[in-house]
Amino acid sequence: MFVTIAIPVYNGESYLRDAIQSVVNQTFQDWELYLVNDGSTDGSLAIMQEYALRDIRIKVIDDGQNKGLVTRLNQSIEIAVGKYYARMDADDIMYITRIEEQVKFLESH
């Protein structure tokens, strides 16, 4: 994988599908996505697992505990295999060419 993308999630059920789908729809497709559950108590984990079953590039990290954003980001960095690392929040939507544009910029500098 060229780019590792991480989305830490805490109770993001109402908007998580849009966030994940915005990654899936990227024009740049050589990525892996870590959905890092931070002890969600809503339906977030089920949504994450649903997407992971549909796309082998999507992986769910879940230990059932709430440890906070920084811990979850560090956890995803430790397991990332991509040359580059990107993150976004579970309530965000990634512009369709975001990763493509960022990779082009990074590779040219």
Q: What is each stretch, according to the model?
A:
Residues 1-109:
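Nucleotide-sugar donor-binding/catalytic module of glycosyltransferases
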